[in-house]
Amino acid sequence: MDKHVILRNEEERDWPAVERLTRRAFYNQYVPGCVEHYLAKRLRSHPDFIPELDLVLELEGQVIANVMYTKNRLVDEGGEEREILTFGPLCVAPEHQRKGYGRLLLEGSFQRAAGLGCDTVVIFGDPANYVSRGFKSGCPARRPLRSSARPSSRRGPAG
Protein backbone atom coordinates (compact mmCIF):
# COMPACT_ATOMS: atom_id res chain seq x y z
CA MET A 1 0.00 0.00 0.00
CA ASP A 2 1.27 3.47 -0.90
CA LYS A 3 2.32 5.75 1.97
CA HIS A 4 0.83 8.83 0.31
CA VAL A 5 -2.76 8.03 1.14
CA ILE A 6 -5.00 10.70 2.65
CA LEU A 7 -8.21 9.95 4.57
CA ARG A 8 -10.46 13.00 4.57
CA ASN A 9 -14.06 14.12 4.48
CA GLU A 10 -15.76 14.09 1.11
CA GLU A 11 -16.20 17.59 -0.32
CA GLU A 12 -18.79 18.75 -2.82
CA ARG A 13 -16.11 18.86 -5.53
CA ASP A 14 -15.66 15.07 -4.99
CA TRP A 15 -19.30 14.16 -5.64
CA PRO A 16 -19.03 13.33 -9.38
CA ALA A 17 -15.83 11.31 -8.85
CA VAL A 18 -17.35 9.40 -5.91
CA GLU A 19 -20.48 8.57 -7.89
CA ARG A 20 -18.38 7.32 -10.84
CA LEU A 21 -16.16 5.33 -8.48
CA THR A 22 -19.20 3.78 -6.78
CA ARG A 23 -20.72 2.79 -10.13
CA ARG A 24 -17.44 1.18 -11.25
CA ALA A 25 -16.99 -0.69 -7.96
CA PHE A 26 -20.51 -2.14 -7.88
CA TYR A 27 -21.40 -2.54 -11.55
CA ASN A 28 -22.67 -6.09 -12.23
CA GLN A 29 -21.44 -7.31 -8.82
CA TYR A 30 -24.73 -8.58 -7.37
CA VAL A 31 -27.29 -7.79 -10.06
CA PRO A 32 -27.03 -6.53 -13.63
CA GLY A 33 -26.02 -2.87 -13.47
CA CYS A 34 -26.07 -1.19 -10.06
CA VAL A 35 -27.90 1.42 -7.99
CA GLU A 36 -25.27 2.18 -5.34
CA HIS A 37 -24.07 5.35 -7.10
CA TYR A 38 -27.64 6.67 -7.02
CA LEU A 39 -27.87 5.79 -3.32
CA ALA A 40 -24.66 7.76 -2.69
CA LYS A 41 -26.15 10.78 -4.45
CA ARG A 42 -29.43 10.56 -2.49
CA LEU A 43 -27.85 9.93 0.92
CA ARG A 44 -26.15 13.32 1.05
CA SER A 45 -29.52 15.07 1.39
CA HIS A 46 -31.12 12.53 3.75
CA PRO A 47 -31.77 13.73 7.34
CA ASP A 48 -29.99 10.68 8.79
CA PHE A 49 -26.82 11.26 6.75
CA ILE A 50 -23.71 11.98 8.86
CA PRO A 51 -21.42 14.37 6.93
CA GLU A 52 -18.61 13.88 9.48
CA LEU A 53 -18.52 10.20 8.46
CA ASP A 54 -18.67 10.75 4.70
CA LEU A 55 -15.07 9.88 3.94
CA VAL A 56 -12.82 9.43 0.94
CA LEU A 57 -9.41 7.88 0.56
CA GLU A 58 -7.18 9.84 -1.78
CA LEU A 59 -4.09 8.43 -3.49
CA GLU A 60 -1.85 10.76 -5.51
CA GLY A 61 -4.67 13.31 -5.78
CA GLN A 62 -7.30 10.80 -6.94
CA VAL A 63 -10.25 9.55 -4.89
CA ILE A 64 -9.89 5.75 -4.80
CA ALA A 65 -12.36 4.80 -2.04
CA ASN A 66 -15.41 6.14 -0.22
CA VAL A 67 -17.72 5.29 2.68
CA MET A 68 -20.89 7.00 3.90
CA TYR A 69 -22.71 6.58 7.23
CA THR A 70 -26.26 7.20 8.42
CA LYS A 71 -27.92 7.26 11.83
CA ASN A 72 -30.36 4.48 12.58
CA ARG A 73 -31.82 2.58 15.50
CA LEU A 74 -32.10 -1.02 16.51
CA VAL A 75 -35.21 -2.22 18.37
CA ASP A 76 -35.23 -5.54 20.22
CA GLU A 77 -38.23 -7.82 20.83
CA GLY A 78 -38.96 -6.00 24.11
CA GLY A 79 -39.15 -2.62 22.38
CA GLU A 80 -35.85 -1.34 23.74
CA GLU A 81 -34.14 1.01 21.29
CA ARG A 82 -30.47 1.59 20.70
CA GLU A 83 -29.01 4.31 18.50
CA ILE A 84 -26.65 2.81 15.94
CA LEU A 85 -24.83 3.64 12.73
CA THR A 86 -25.11 1.97 9.36
CA PHE A 87 -22.67 2.43 6.53
CA GLY A 88 -22.80 2.01 2.83
CA PRO A 89 -22.01 2.17 0.20
CA LEU A 90 -18.37 1.43 0.93
CA CYS A 91 -16.38 1.10 -2.25
CA VAL A 92 -12.83 0.88 -3.51
CA ALA A 93 -11.84 1.43 -7.14
CA PRO A 94 -11.56 -1.99 -8.81
CA GLU A 95 -7.85 -1.52 -9.62
CA HIS A 96 -7.13 -0.81 -5.93
CA GLN A 97 -9.20 -3.60 -4.37
CA ARG A 98 -7.55 -6.29 -2.21
CA LYS A 99 -4.63 -3.99 -1.37
CA GLY A 100 -5.71 -2.89 2.12
CA TYR A 101 -7.36 0.39 1.16
CA GLY A 102 -10.85 -0.76 2.19
CA ARG A 103 -9.52 -1.83 5.59
CA LEU A 104 -7.75 1.52 6.02
CA LEU A 105 -10.94 3.38 5.12
CA LEU A 106 -13.10 1.25 7.42
CA GLU A 107 -10.74 1.49 10.41
CA GLY A 108 -10.36 5.23 9.96
CA SER A 109 -14.13 5.62 9.82
CA PHE A 110 -14.55 3.52 12.99
CA GLN A 111 -12.09 5.78 14.83
CA ARG A 112 -14.00 8.86 13.74
CA ALA A 113 -17.33 7.26 14.69
CA ALA A 114 -15.97 6.42 18.15
CA GLY A 115 -14.84 10.03 18.46
CA LEU A 116 -18.46 11.06 17.88
CA GLY A 117 -19.59 8.74 20.69
CA CYS A 118 -20.90 5.96 18.45
CA ASP A 119 -20.11 2.37 19.41
CA THR A 120 -22.39 0.16 17.30
CA VAL A 121 -22.42 -0.33 13.53
CA VAL A 122 -24.91 -2.61 11.76
CA ILE A 123 -24.69 -3.30 8.04
CA PHE A 124 -26.26 -5.31 5.25
CA GLY A 125 -23.32 -6.81 3.43
CA ASP A 126 -21.41 -9.90 2.47
CA PRO A 127 -20.08 -11.36 5.75
CA ALA A 128 -16.92 -12.55 3.98
CA ASN A 129 -15.97 -8.91 3.46
CA TYR A 130 -16.45 -7.84 7.08
CA VAL A 131 -15.80 -10.68 9.57
CA SER A 132 -12.08 -9.87 9.61
CA ARG A 133 -13.05 -6.41 10.93
CA GLY A 134 -15.01 -7.88 13.86
CA PHE A 135 -18.50 -8.04 12.35
CA LYS A 136 -20.71 -11.02 13.10
CA SER A 137 -23.61 -12.29 11.04
CA GLY A 138 -26.96 -11.29 12.50
CA CYS A 139 -28.77 -14.04 10.59
CA PRO A 140 -26.86 -17.29 11.11
CA ALA A 141 -29.94 -19.27 10.04
CA ARG A 142 -29.90 -17.33 6.76
CA ARG A 143 -33.61 -16.62 6.94
CA PRO A 144 -34.78 -14.42 4.08
CA LEU A 145 -36.05 -10.96 4.93
CA ARG A 146 -39.77 -10.40 4.84
CA SER A 147 -40.58 -8.30 1.80
CA SER A 148 -41.66 -5.45 4.10
CA ALA A 149 -38.32 -5.62 5.94
CA ARG A 150 -36.04 -4.79 3.03
CA PRO A 151 -33.33 -2.25 3.83
CA SER A 152 -34.36 1.31 3.18
CA SER A 153 -33.10 4.79 3.86
CA ARG A 154 -35.77 5.56 6.43
CA ARG A 155 -35.68 4.98 10.16
CA GLY A 156 -37.45 1.95 11.49
CA PRO A 157 -37.05 -1.25 13.43
CA ALA A 158 -34.68 -3.81 12.02
CA GLY A 159 -36.53 -6.67 10.31
Predicted features along the sequence, with ranges:
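NAD(P)-dependent dehydrogenase/reductase Rossmann-like domain
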Residues: 60, 149-159
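Conserved N-terminal entry element of GNAT/NAT acetyltransferase domains
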Residues: 1-13, 20
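A short, internal acetyl-CoA/4′-phosphopantetheine-binding micro-motif in the GNAT/acyltransferase core
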Residues: 89-97
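Active-site rim helix/loop that mediates acceptor-substrate recognition in acyltransferases
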Residues: 19, 23-68, 73-74
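Conserved acetyl-CoA pyrophosphate-binding loop and the N-cap/start of the following alpha-helix
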Residues: 96, 100-108, 118
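A short, polar/charged loop-to-alpha-helix boundary motif
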Residues: 73-82
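Conserved active-site alpha-helix within GNAT-family acetyltransferase domains
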Residues: 115-121, 125-149
